[in-house]
């Protein structure tokens, strides 16, 4: 009897030892899975950050630029009468002289994106239509969610701040025999500006806000030109035109995209700016990143299945036999 009891005790001990080894292996397997899950989540979150940072920077930049345009409009609204009217009158006189002279120069040198700053030397130009800090007014394109201040000239320092007015084109105050050219950067990581200009179609509208007035324009012409080609930027007798210009193709920038519109009455020919909405959804890459994050982040907080580290019990029905 003693021998049989001892044999049974050793059998139970070996079984318990096997169970403990199995538990240890399970714990190691669970730990490995947990580490892999955490690594996957970290990689997904890193990708989310890479995708989100430009979006955040662009949103912050757009908000700041829109704020500049709004502050400039409020400052003009606070001017004593008839300062704004006199400023518009001087700008229209400037445009008449420009049309009569035949536009001998267009741009800082030849191309507004060269970075030169020739307009700065023309004090008559820089002092005309100045709402303060070099701001003329603002360009609003509701369909692509653009609201930028318009500055004198198209130097690199200006285009970092907002849209620039092409030196040698009409000042953006409307009127017959005028053609104002507004330029903006495209494809910057930290700012959208005119990045989405290629989404506009014929019939879409944009708006120039200047000295308390809002001028509506309806797009009738979209074209691509060589940087040195200014034929489509010149004044045409009888027209009241504004052309928006940026670099193209996206990221290559060897040509210039022109989106041009003729003056249109608000609200008979174009709607109020407030009635136009940007209906573009979030970019697919951003949506995908957020979906992945929503699925993966909970893994960080998921508790693993608890496996007892030690146990002194033998499974039911396997109690060790004791000698009487």
Describe each region flagged by the PLM.
Residues 5-18:
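N-terminal intrinsically disordered, acidic low-complexity segments at the extreme N-terminus
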Residues 18-19, 23-26, 30-284, 315, ...:
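Solvent-exposed, non-transmembrane regions of membrane-associated and secreted proteins
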Residues 273-324:
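C-terminal single-pass membrane-anchor helix
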């Amino acid at each position: 009897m003693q021998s049989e009891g001892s044999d049974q005790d050793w059998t139970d001990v070996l079984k318990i030892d096997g169970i403990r080894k199995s538990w240890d292996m399970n714990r190691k397997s669970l730990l490995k899975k947990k580490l892999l899950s955490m690594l996957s989540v970290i990689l997904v979150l890193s990708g989310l950050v890479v995708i989100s940072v430009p979006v955040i920077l662009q949103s912050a930049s757009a908000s700041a630029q829109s704020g500049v345009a709004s502050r400039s409009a409020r400052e003009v609204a606070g001017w004593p009468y008839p300062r704004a009217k006199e400023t518009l009158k001087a700008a229209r006189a400037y445009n008449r002289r420009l049309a009569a002279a035949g536009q001998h120069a267009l741009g800082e040198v030849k191309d507004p994106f060269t970075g030169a700053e020739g307009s700065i030397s023309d004090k008559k130009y820089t002092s005309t239509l100045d709402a303060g800090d070099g701001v003329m007014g603002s360009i609003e394109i509701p369909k692509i969610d653009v609201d930028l201040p318009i500055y004198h000239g198209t130097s690199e320092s200006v285009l970092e701040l907002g849209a620039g007015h092409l030196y040698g084109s009409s000042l953006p105050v409307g009127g017959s025999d005028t053609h104002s050219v507004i330029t903006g950067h495209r494809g910057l990581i930290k700012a959208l500006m005119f990045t989405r200009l290629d989404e506009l179609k014929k019939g879409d509208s944009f708006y120039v806000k200047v000295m308390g007035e809002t001028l509506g324009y309806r797009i009738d012409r979209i074209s691509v030109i060589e940087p040195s080609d200014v034929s489509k930027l010149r004044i045409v007798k009888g027209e009241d035109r504004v052309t928006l210009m940026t670099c193209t193709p996206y990221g290559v920038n060897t040509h210039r995209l022109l989106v041009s519109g003729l003056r249109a009455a608000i609200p008979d020919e174009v709607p109020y700016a407030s009635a136009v909405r940007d209906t573009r959804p979030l970019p697919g890459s951003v949506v995908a990143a957020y979906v992945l994050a929503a699925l993966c982040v909970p893994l960080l907080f998921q508790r693993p299945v608890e496996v007892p580290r030690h146990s002194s019990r033998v499974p039911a029905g396997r109690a060790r036999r004791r000698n009487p």
